[in-house]
From Swiss-Prot:
Xref: Pfam families: Lyase_aromatic
PROSITE patterns membership: PAL_HISTIDASE
Organism of provenance: Phoma sp. (strain ATCC 20986 / MF5453)
Single biological process term from Gene Ontology: L-phenylalanine catabolic process
Cross-link (5-imidazolinone (Ala-Gly)): A182-G184
Binding-site list for (E)-cinnamate: N241, Q336, R342, N372, K443, E471, N474
GO cellular component, one term: cytoplasm
Keyword Signal among UniProt keywords: no
Active-site residues, Swiss-Prot/TrEMBL: Y77
GO molecular function ontology, one term from the record: phenylalanine ammonia-lyase activity
Enzymatic reactions: L-phenylalanine = (E)-cinnamate + NH4(+)
Name of the protein: Phenylalanine ammonia-lyase
EC number: 4.3.1.24
Length: 729
């Protein structure tokens, strides 16, 4: 097994999606369908095709078997019977059964806003009552793939009609609620079947983007020159009696969840650098002694992303250890990082493993037959069973949703620690770049992320234990797979918001860490050179030099430990601490060494020296502060993988370091009439969120993963192995 299976799977799916988008179409043959292909159809206008002669032959053979069975004495469900708990009825004319099935299923709620038709408005409706078009497109593609396996007795003509709907951008408007995913997703699929029938009361979206319009299915078929389809024996049931809606939306969910979880792993690296973490907890030995594959994979990814960082310490085998002379945190406090960082591999690892299993379950479902009864092409027999029960999808998406909550909890804990100056190893309160009494920068983000995590935790509760008996107690157990998938997609949206907020805060924290660390580095150097001139006459230079090393460290600690003070007060406190240690090293450490020299100053001389040092610090800090805000140097000090995510934020999106109150937008700071000017923090976080939603951030993560040597995961290697078990008819 690969040592990085989730990352390699994600890179493989990412490459596969790019490949399909450039190709523009996907051949459906009943097996080999992956979640990337579903996403390509749903989100990127990639059209499914069915042109394989063997597939067409399977469809023809399946319908011939059904026709022969109908002519015989065998009782076939849905052909000679009613449906569900009413299957004890025996209709005299089975030709109307398909229409009767559509009538009983097309019962979902849609409001006039969904349909763009005249009627009283419903301003109290907060959310649309219809499925997103992308879900419906994905559902159609998945149902086609399930049907072309040849077990549902669907005609080739019917499949071609479904394909034409997608190709001509006719997307049925499907109610969001009403499926219990027991006998498949009956209600959603019935609206797709109703579109094929040309129902004047089923509505569709024709076209995409600004050119899209809402018309009836009857009008839409007329516009593309397609006749309404008269469903053949059992075809109505064959179209609706499956798990396609659950499987399709679960495919989108697992793809997004895998990417968000990997992004959260990379984001933990940024937080570690912002917090100047002591990352010995990433040593391979720790994972080797507890060999859960997910834990080892997380640690390996993080080690690779942090390689070369001058903001963290403790990476094993550092070839550039001599570079780690930058003082990035106080040398007091906890000797180990708190659990949100130190145990992140142990926390994220099980989520990696669950996502791999969920992906496997969903991929199998995409390439399975879900219907009843089934046609056996080898024997010609009809088999009655329950392959429509979508519990495998429920199992998958509930694992995904639980994993999302766990990832969110980790990010929430990391973020609130990073923003809190009493826990973040020397960064200012709320990650404010100016005086903490004037600016509260990321405090609102802390509140937002708590809100997102609360909702995410609520959504993570199991759906499957809320099953209600339905349909004359015939469907007494039902999977609720589509319902669970809907809530999983909501959870993905929330975690995406959290990732966006934490990424914004982490970039700010890294900037501040570098700004203060480089200030101390340059200032203590100049201070050491200037100290002889600041001291009263009569002190030997040798004595001063012996005291300086300890005093400088005392100065650095005082600076980090007083991050909650405004700059003027911080400089004053730091100057006092420096002079105190210079005069008496025991003020800094109790185990005073013989070589430590105590400089004997009078009280007046001490006050004068403190004032001189304070003035030196104040001038140096304000000069350094202004220069850094003008041109941050953060990228020179961070790990290669972290740098990719940092630069994506700072350069690709153009989101600058927050300078404090000066960056709050107001009419006065518009550069020119009509310009946007400065942005709120929320606007910047929204830009990041949009980049997460449209895949740009993960694309950068994928590139960075390869740049740091984490494997290619190419479509010709990993993908073939990942799906080897499923690529059989």
């Amino acid at each position: 097994m690969s040592s990085r299976p989730l990352l390699k799977l994600a890179l493989s799916l990412h490459d596969r999606l790019d490949e399909l988008c450039s190709r523009g179409q996907i051949a459906l043959v009943g097996y080999g369908l992956d979640v990337a292909a579903v996403a390509a159809v749903a989100r990127h206008e990639c059209f499914p095709i069915v042109d394989d002669e063997e597939v067409i032959a399977r469809l023809n053979e399946s319908t011939e078997i059904l026709e022969r069975s109908c002519r015989g004495s065998t009782m076939i469900y849905g052909v000679h019977t009613g449906f569900g708990g009413s299957a004890d009825t025996r209709p005299d004319d089975s030709s109307g059964l398909g229409r009767g099935l559509m009538q009983l299923l097309q019962t979902g709620v849609l409001v006039v806003e969904n349909l763009n038709i005249s009627g009283p408005s419903t301003p109290q409706i907060m959310m649309p009552q219809s499925m997103p078009s992308s879900w419906t497109k994905a559902t159609t593609a998945v149902r086609i793939n399930q049907c072309v396996r040849g077990h549902s007795a669907i005609r080739h003509q019917t499949v071609k009609s479904l394909l034409k709907l997608v190709a001509t951008q006719i997307t049925p408007i499907v109610p969001l609620r009403g499926s219990i995913s027991a006998s498949g997703d009956l209600m959603p699929l019935s609206y797709i079947a109703g579109t094929l029938e040309g129902s004047p009361d089923i509505y569709v979206t024709k076209g995409s983007g600004k050119s899209a319009k809402i018309i009836s299915a009857h009008e839409a078929l007329g516009e593309i020159g397609m006749k309404p389809l008269l469903l053949g024996p059992r075809e109505g049931l064959g179209l609706v009696n499956g798990t396609a809606t659950s499987a399709a939306t679960a495919s989108l969910a697992v793809l997004d969840a895998i990417q968000l979880t990997l992004l959260s792993t990379g984001l933990t690296c940024l937080v570690s650098e912002g917090m100047a973490a002591r990352v010995e907890w990433l040593h391979p030995f720790i994972a080797e002694t507890r060999p859960h594959p997910g834990q080892g994979e997380v640690a390996a990814i993080m080690r690779a992303f942090l390689k070369g960082s001058r903001l963290v310490s403790g990476l094993e085998g550092e070839a550039n250890a001599h570079l780690h002379t930058l003082n990035v945190r106080p040398d007091e406090g906890l000797p180990q990082d708190r659990y949100p960082l130190r145990t992140s591999p142990q926390w994220l690892g099980p989520q990696f493993e669950d996502l791999l299993l969920a992906h496997s379950q969903i991929t199998i479902e995409l390439n399975s037959t879900s219907d009843n009864p089934l046609t056996n092409l080898k024997t010609g027999a009809m088999h009655h069973g329950g392959n429509f029960q979508a519990t495998s999808i429920t199992s998958a998406v509930e694992k995904i949703r639980t994993s999302l909550q766990m990832v969110g909890k980790l990010l929430f804990s990391q973020c609130t620690e990073m923003i809190n100056h009493q826990m973040n190893a020397g960064l200012p309160p709320n990650l404010a770049a100016d005086d903490p009494s004037a600016s509260f920068c990321c405090k609102g983000l802390d509140i937002n992320i708590a809100a997102y995590q609360s909702e995410l935790s609520y959504l993570s509760n199991s759906i499957s234990n809320h099953v209600q008996s339905a349909e004359m107690h015939n469907q007494a157990v039902n999977s609720l797979a589509f319902l669970s998938t809907r809530y999983t997609i909501k959870a993905i949206e929330l975690l995406g918001m959290m990732v966006a907020g934490v990424l914004y805060a982490a970039c700010q924290a890294m900037d501040l860490r570098v700004m203060h660390a480089t200030f101390l580095d340059t200032t203590t150097s100049t201070l050491q050179k200037a100290i002889a001139d600041l001291l009263p006459n009569g002190f030997k230079s040798d004595d001063v030099e012996k005291s300086l090393a300890t005093a400088v460290q005392g100065l650095r600690n005082a600076w980090w430990n007083n991050a909650g003070s405004d700059a003027s007060e911080r400089c004053s406190i730091t100057a006092i601490a420096f002079v105190q240690v210079l005069c008496d090293p025991s003020k800094y450490h109790t185990d005073t060494h013989k070589e430590d020299i105590c400089l004997d100053l009078t009280a007046k001389e001490m006050r004068q020296l403190q004032d001189d040092v304070r003035l030196h610090l104040s001038k140096a800090y304000h000069k350094h502060h202004s220069a850094f805000l003008e041109k941050p140097t953060t990228e020179e000090y961070i790990g290669k993988g972290s740098k990719a995510l940092y630069l994506w934020t700072r350069q690709d999106l153009g989101i600058p370091m927050n300078r404090g109150l000066i960056d709050h937008p107001s009419p006065e700071n518009l550069k020119e009439p009509g310009s946007v000017g400065k942005r709120t923090i929320g606007s910047y976080v929204s830009m990041i969120y949009q980049g997460i939603q449209d895949g740009r951030l993960f694309k950068r993560f994928a590139t960075a993963s390869r740049e740091v040597g984490l494997g290619d995961g190419g479509v010709n290697g990993t993908r073939k192995r990942a799906y080897a078990d499923y690529e059989t008819p």
